[in-house]
């Protein structure tokens, strides 16, 4: 059970880290749009995915650690 949860979390973070498309912000449409500085949910997700890209080396090391754990600890 714990191994399944760790594997799920690892795969989810890997999927976010290897996304390779441009994440653009929506351009303002009107005159007063620059006054609105509230971040939407889409903006927060975009920032999170962009921050994951900077941690690719740590994610790779985590993957190696997880492979080791799957062989040694969770193997039958």
Curated annotation (Swiss-Prot):
Membrane topology recorded in Swiss-Prot or TrEMBL = Single-pass type I membrane protein
Q: Which keywords does this Swiss-Prot/TrEMBL entry list? A: Membrane, Signal, Transmembrane, Transmembrane helix
According to the UniProt entry, where is the signal peptide?
1-17
Q: Which residues lie on this side of the membrane: Cytoplasmic?
A: 76
Q: Where does this chain mainly localize? A: membrane
Q: Does the keyword Magnesium apply?
A: no
The membrane spanning regions, by residue number, are 55-75
Task: Outline which residue ranges sit on the Extracellular face.
Answer: 18-54
Q: Does the keyword Cytoplasm apply?
A: no
Localization of this protein: Membrane
List, alphabetically, the GO terms of the cellular component aspect.
membrane
The cross-references to InterPro entries, in alphabetical order and at most eight, read: SMIM7
- Which family is this sequence assigned to? Belongs to the SMIM7 family.
Q: What is this protein called?
A: Small integral membrane protein 7
Native organism is: Xenopus tropicalis
């Amino acid at each position: 059970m714990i191994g399944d949860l760790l594997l799920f979390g690892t795969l989810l973070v890997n999927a976010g880290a290897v996304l390779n498309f441009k994440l653009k912000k929506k351009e303002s449409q009107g005159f007063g749009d620059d006054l609105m500085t509230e971040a939407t949910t889409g903006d927060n997700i975009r920032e999170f995915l962009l921050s994951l890209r900077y941690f690719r080396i740590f994610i790779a090391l985590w993957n190696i650690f997880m492979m080791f754990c799957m062989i040694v600890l969770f193997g039958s």
